[in-house]
Amino acid sequence: MMHRIDRRTFIRRTVQTAIAAAAGGLPVLDLLSMPAQAGQAPPLAVRKGQDIPLLVRETISALDGMENFVKPGDVVVVKPNIGWDRTVELAANTHPEVVKALVQLCLEAGAKQVRIFDRTCNDERRCYMQSGIRPAVESIRSDRVSIEYIDRRSFKELAINGGRAFDRWEFYLPVIEADRLINVPVAKHHSISRLTLAMKNLMGVIGGNRGRLHHNIAESLSDIASVIHSDLTVVDATRILTANGPQGGRLQDVRKLDTLIASPDIVAADAYASTLFGLSPEQVPTVVAAARRGLGVMDLKQVRMV
């Protein structure tokens, strides 16, 4: 059995205190940047297969099952990339079958509620439909599952203690207040950050002018990840976008790998995913910056393959 630091309860309580303080005219409470647990090699599961529901189950089973991450009564956010008005085969968004299978595992583990959302780049209604994610989630037909558009009234500005690029930003309260966050990016090339993986997928749960983050993208994403803790990261590499990311649009830029990567360590997951593009983790600035901040393990020799 793996032992993890559960930061969700900590973050939820500090945010609630911060909001109460702000309402009373006091300064917003700093959210402490919490480093990864020292002295333990984080587990990393990598599996291949063309049957996506089975692939998801086998990958999560290697991490002791979804029950290791989701407890009965938990409110869970499953955060895929739904940012683009692109169809499944173009690899701009997380594969809908990956999302559906993860949601089903959360329900089987006893989740009280599973919420799926993303702050899209293109029109949200088209993104949710064209990606195939809305139809896939709705096909589960459970009143414990909801796929939602972002409610822009639910962003709150919070201070980032020790921020390198920013000392405060707007965060989406439903993801902060959830008991568990499952971060489910698709692996893609990115014209600015080189790759867009789990770290960058967190941009879908922040407010404000996200373009400002691109001026110092590596440190900006580390700032965000120091506040938003992913309890489980699942990188969709069933097909990857090798060029012209993040939006893509050409089938010749897509490579089918039938691969899934999962870990409770967001940095380790991104580090391994970078190798699928022929890169070492040291060549991906977002991975390097996060590892230096103590947000996870970049050296793949220090992870425990399961």
Spans of model-derived segments:
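N-terminal and secondary-structure boundary signal
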Residues: 2-306
